[in-house]
Regions:
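Active-site Tyr-X3-Lys motif and surrounding loop/helix of classical short-chain dehydrogenase/reductase
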Residues: 1-5
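Active-site helix of classical SDR
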Residues: 15, 52
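Hydrophobic alpha-helical topogenic segments used for membrane insertion/localization
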Residues: 200-226
Length: 256
């Protein structure tokens, strides 16, 4: 209940206050809510958190449609981060009796912040930060009957931090913690860039890159068809390691 008061009702109340303000503002504005990749794909151990983020997604989508019906010039965006380099696991209430972590890939906090700022000036309905999380969510959406047994088997072990037996003396469920941390300090690798988010923010550039790659592939295919197998065999011969050695001399050396 406490988690929902913060994760869900905090978003609801904040969004409604923002909508009232932006209705009266000339030019409207943007409401950007932060969901999670777990808005799309629930996982064990984090069931209540997943449920709260599903609720955030449902409310955000409904709010967008209600504002559309009103004709309000208010864009509503949902940002869905994957695993992020925050002290999330330190500050959450941990009932497992084990040290926990977010599985890789983990992204830096500024990657999410930059995406939120982009949504403030570029209306985007929904955007995911982190390709790994998007892959998991797509897999769950396409094959839930296959995904759920796999998640049940492997997700808890992937979230366990075997490098540390550390357990928090306090958590942030009811009161703020006093460790002063805004980033986790133990992740061996933190990604500073999300290609998936950049593609979503700049679809024209992404389409151009795909077109260039498709053109190169087509040109290669046409060249092969025009030159025929003779040219192809010549290229293979140049890069055939068997032709780079003296087979007779090698056989003699082995016999000796």
């Amino acid at each position: 209940r406490r988690l929902f008061e913060t994760n869900y009702w905090g978003v609801v109340n904040g969004s409604l206050v923002a909508a009232d303000h932006l209705r009266e503002r000339e030019g409207g504005g943007a409401i950007i809510n932060v969901g999670s990749i777990l808005s799309d794909a629930p996982i064990p151990v984090q069931g209540v958190y997943s449920a709260s983020k599903h609720a955030v997604k449902g409310f955000t989508n409904a709010l967008r449609m209600e504002l559309m019906r009103e004709g309000a010039t208010i864009a509503v965006s949902l940002v869905k981060p994957g695993a992020i380099d925050t002290p999330y696991n330190r500050h959450a209430r941990n009932l497992t009796g084990q040290a926990m972590q977010n599985p890789q890939p983990v992204y830096a906090t500024h990657v999410v912040a930059d995406t939120i700022l982009y949504c403030a000036s570029h209306p985007i309905r929904e955007i995911t930060v982190g390709g790994g999380g998007r892959l998991i969510a797509s897999f769950y959406s396409a094959l839930p009957g296959v995904a759920e047994p796999l998640f049940a088997r492997f997700a808890p072990s992937l979230m366990r931090d075997r490098r540390s037996a550390w357990q928090p003396d306090e958590d942030g469920l009811y009161d703020p913690t006093e460790d002063g941390l805004d980033e986790e300090v133990y992740y061996p690798m933190v990604r500073q860039f999300s290609a998936l988010a950049e593609v979503r923010k700049h679809p024209g550039i992404a389409a151009g890159v795909v077109a260039v790659l498709a053109g190169v592939g087509l040109a290669t295919l046409l060249l092969n068809q025009r030159t025929g197998p003779t040219r192809l065999e010549t290229l293979r011969g140049r890069f055939n390691p068997r032709e780079w050695m003296d087979a007779t001399g090698l056989r003699t050396h082995i016999d000796d």
